[in-house]
A protein has these predicted regions:
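Hydrophobic membrane-targeting and insertion signals
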Residues: 28, 35-40
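A cross-kingdom feature marking solvent-exposed beta-strand/loop segments within repeated
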Residues: 38-54, 115-123, 145
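Acidic, Ser/Thr- and Gly-enriched intrinsically disordered low-complexity segments
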Residues: 46, 60-63, 70-75, 115-119
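Structured core of small recognition/catalytic domains
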Residues: 121-175
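Intrinsic disorder/low-complexity detector
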Residues: 4, 9, 14-16, 21-30, ...
Length: 175
């Protein structure tokens, strides 16, 4: 598809631009904060809260995925909140459960005005500490052609990430 002013052109067909909007990113992450009652080792019941990051297309899909994943091990599950996340990319090394949010800033040229502007990108990286998260984020971005800086790295409360899984058609085995 080629964008031409206020129309979209696909082969010989011309469509109004509003009718053919595409999402800015294929990955859309949501924060889901849930609370539940958990029995402690001493037999007492304690209310706990956990935050999850879910790669989903909607709030409804986010809720369904968390219920499917977490509901197996927890009975009374309550949603405290579901919100859009600014995270645009997840980099997992699989060696730790700590997740850090890295703010990456790079300069870009605005195609409309031709002026230079700063663009912010948020990347989630798992690491053992802030320094390792910074190094891993920097290593992940080393092939980026424009200069960038990482002004902020902070630990998050995310305990699990549920990436999108393509549904398996009926009659096929999942690998």
């Amino acid at each position: 598809l080629i964008s031409v002013e206020k129309t979209m052109v696909a082969g010989d067909a011309v469509f109004p631009a509003a009718a053919t909007k595409t999402p800015k990113s294929m990955n859309q992450y949501f924060f889901a904060k849930v609370s539940f009652l958990r029995q402690q080792n001493d037999g007492t019941i304690k209310k706990e809260s956990e935050q999850y990051l879910v790669d989903a297309m909607s709030f409804t899909e986010t809720e369904a995925r968390v219920i499917r994943e977490v509901g197996e091990s927890v009975r009374d599950l309550y949603f405290d909140s579901i919100a859009h996340s600014p995270i645009q990319e997840v980099v997992s090394y699989g060696d730790t459960d700590l997740w850090f949010k890295c703010k990456v800033v790079y300069k870009d040229v605005d195609p409309d005005s031709g002026k230079e502007k700063k663009t912010t990108l948020y990347i989630l990286v798992n690491a053992n500490d802030v320094n390792e998260a910074y190094d891993r984020c920097k290593d992940h971005l080393k092939s980026m052609l424009v200069p960038f800086e990482i002004p902020k790295v902070e630990e998050t409360a995310i305990c699990e990430i549920y990436q999108y899984e393509k549904p398996v058609p009926a009659g096929y085995l999942k690998r």
